[in-house]
Amino acid sequence: MSGPPFRRTAMRASVLFEQRTPLKVEDVELEAPRAGEVRVRMAASGVCHSCLHAADGSWTGVPVPIVLGDEGAGVVEAVGPGVQTLRAGDHVILSWAPTCGRCHYCVIGRPNLCEQRRPGQGVLPEGTSRMSLGGRPVYQYGHVATYASVTVVAESSAIAIDKNMPLDRAALIGCSVMTGVGAVINTAAVPPGASMAVFGVGGVGLNAVQGGAMVAAQPIIAVDVVGGKLESARQLGATHAIDASKEDPVAEIRRITRRGADFTFVAVGDARAVAQAAEALAPGGTCVVIGVPATGATVPLDVRPLVTGERVIRGSSYGSARTREDLPRLVELYRGGRLKIDELITRRYGLDEANEAFRALAAGELARGLIVF
């Protein structure tokens, strides 16, 4: 093993004991990394809607007790046997989508769909958690559990980056930036000059707007019900903003584009937004669904326009990421001034303020909140 040897250590983590109850900061025991795993001391973690949905019960079946957090960055402290790509001292972005490199999807170049991925089950790829409390297992949300001062993750969940990249900014690349930018560039492959609309411009949606600006989409239309978010979208590249609480977004998109949008992106977990985004498509257009609605949500759709207009509705999981290539590339885009991250960070919190971060996120007050350690 590289790095200081240990068998078990205590660290501080924000634990969800039951859905619909507040998080509690506890001293949680952390087991040493096993074969193919690494121990990471966290620098920062983003506050993501997926974690809010897990906590507030929107998503059912979340195992408890569990340490939430699915995007973050930190420094490798130790590595387990067989680790090849990392060593103690490396700066890493954590990814909730580990890859095995051997399954059907990894082999065909779609590692974000790896068959070993099980983020909702609260365990590492080999099937267990490295965290415990009073002898009871504590689950690790999204394979990484970033609401902890220290965590153990699979080697493929930790992507080494340039040490000159600030770790608090790097934390957001691990999910919201990758998911939003990747949906535009990887999943949809939006060409220059194509029109696009983004429904929901929170953390992920703002990054979809940024992705559109990177590929020179025109126009880029932001849709939300919160005025402050629409203003942020304009700062990040949106050419038009629609307040869906005051205007019909479908009618406005058609007015702006004259025929409907070539691409629409749904970056909010709302089935109604999916229906609107599909209706706003131009013939031949593609609706990309990024946000995951509450468990059991369904979308009423008029199928005829899909067929006669050859419109497409498809999902985008994690921005169709190839993490080992895409995450370092996003770091370089930030360092080169082409990707804005500082502007995404609305507020910083300590670990003991995670409940307040969730409240602010639910109230629409945050583009992205950041827990710093």
Question: Over which residues does each language-model region extend?
Answer:
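C-terminal hydrophobic helical "lid"/dimerization subdomain
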Residues: 3-9, 255, 263, 275-279, ...
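Residues located in well-ordered beta-strands
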Residues: 12, 24, 29, 41, ...
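Glycine-rich beta-strand-centered segment in the early N-terminal region that forms part
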Residues: 31-45, 58-107, 112, 160-164
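Cysteine-cluster motifs in flexible loop/terminal segments that predominantly coordinate metals
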Residues: 96-150, 154-156
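Mid-domain Rossmann-like dinucleotide-binding core that forms the NAD(H)/NADP(H) cofactor-binding site
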Residues: 149-150, 156-158, 162-247, 251
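Glycine-rich phosphate-binding loop and adjacent beta-alpha segment
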Residues: 270-338, 366, 372-373
